[in-house]
Amino acid sequence: MNRMEAEFSNLVKAYRKRHMGKGPERVTTTFCKSWAICEMAGNLSPVEKFMAKTGDGRQMLRTARTEMVKEIYKDHPPVEMEALLGAKFIQLFVDIDIAQDVGMSVFVFDEDLEKKFGTRNG
């Protein structure tokens, strides 16, 4: 991660904590074209881990941790992320593996972040 990707990761953690009550323990961000791809580990609270012991609980958590997250970003646009990147937030794609407690979020912006911040090594 370069400096901008690390700063973006910190904003994702803070945003999730502020709007969901608990942020991920670790966030790793990679800029690729107009995407900020975030891998997040340690997302679940102790209560959610308990709920994940049943099939119904896992399904409910997966729905909450994907659909609810997208709704939160619609209702509360990530203005701090836009300000950091100087780009407009367009859309969010989210998925989570409840058993492994690892989530992925792909933030789509209106500019090529990879070109803007020179994040490729090849």
Would you name each region that the model predicts?
Residues M1-G122:
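Interaction-mediating elements
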